[in-house]
Amino acid sequence: MPRTQGLALTILRRASTAGLLCAALLATETAWALDYRSVSEVAPAFDAPSAKAKPMFVVQPGTPVELVVSLEGWSKVRDSKGDLVWMEKKHLADKRTVIVRVDRAQVRATGDGKAALVFEAERDVVLELLEAAPAGWVKVRHRDGQSGFLKTQQVWGM
């Protein structure tokens, strides 16, 4: 086989391997995507997956939590402060919410920092997550009905 054909074959093999490696890395990235839920009703958080375990605190409805692991009837979740606790699965909903993590989040009419200000939400206010928006923005709705866009770094739960 001429040297140029051998070189071309080597390049093709390496490109193919690199492509497979990139696909595997992307699949791994997707597999590690965070899974968020919201608390559906006032619910106790426990230190172990049992109703007989020590109750740590009570979680309010709408609070976003990150699902870490699930066992039969129980889920280990992380809250916006980083606390890891166990909750009964029946208290978790698929509805997505976010919680404001800055002193005052500015909710705007569009996903643009120069857009009209719709309202401001203070730290720890829970907002319903409506949809992803332009890069770095998210559309949310306040429980009073007002909706708009805010920067993703101003909230936790995404």
Pin down the residues of each PLM region.
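General helical structural elements
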Residues: 7, 17-18, 108
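SH3-family beta-barrel domains
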Residues: 29-48, 55-61, 68-126, 130-146, ...
